[in-house]
Amino acid sequence: MLFTYNPLSGKGTVKQALSDILTIFTKGGYEVLVRPTLCAGDALEYISRNAAEFDLIVSSGGDGMLHELAYGIYASKADVPCGYIPSGTINDFAASLRIPKNIIRCAEMIMQENFLPVDLGRFNGGCFAYISAFGWFTDVSYVTGQKSKARLGPLAYVLTGLRSFEPKYLRENSGRVRIVWDGGDIEDEFIYCMIGNTHSVGGMRSIVPDGASLTDGLLDCMFVKTPHSLADIDKIKQIVINHKFDSDRTICIKTAGLSISCEKPFRWTLDGERGGEYTSAQIDVLPGALNIAVPPQA
């Protein structure tokens, strides 16, 4: 088994519990190679080159580590199952699959070897585990400081996200976008574009379409049109507060793939991390591409 972990994630809880985690894995019959990550991209590079050498790959950290785990296995083309021990601030993907928040319970759950093939997304040839997005609120996870996240937890995201309703922020993070999918197309001014497989974003279920699934072979997409009045801004706030979608401002679709063209470069987030700036993106589902350990009831 390969076990990679981010020693800086959360409050260093994995590092503190490392001996107990390794004991659980050893009792489960595995010889374990342990690799703490040294920098961003470290786990992705190692997993993509060496995944085929292991019977099981387990990673622990926040959403960034999850991204590297999924992308690394995808890039390796190896048919290897995996486990994920969430130790970040929010952990949307883990929550969607009911993966235990308690580190020890999660390690024990992985040793039950109950694996579920879940969908991944392909983004311009790359890969994401649960979300690709740009626009309103999408940069909160990576512009919020690590110290603030460790000290305040989810509240840190809320405090950072309050600026998302400032007029200057709304102007800078919206623009004309053309979206084409297998069931139609639309061109308009958009403030928020989200494509993924998750039940929550930033810990909030309100900004994810109803009926979202990680195993249906489809991407769950939501697009919010740019507000042009205080009334429009109030409608957007209702999405966050009450999960109330206004048909005039919001478009929700399920699709196996779509293309997005923008009049200006937008900053994308992939699994809560910086994904780069693009004026166009081709996004497709990768059905059942990640075989991950989940609780029996997930």
What is each residue range found by the language model?
Residues 3, 34, 179, 221-223:
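Generic preference for hydrophobic
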Residues 18-21, 74-75, 145-146, 209-212, ...:
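Short, solvent-exposed amphipathic alpha-helical segments in soluble enzyme
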Residues 181-182, 213-216, 223-298:
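ATP/nucleoside-binding phosphotransfer catalytic cores, i.e., glycine-rich phosphate-binding loops
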Residues 124-218:
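ATP/pyrophosphate-binding catalytic subdomain of soluble kinases
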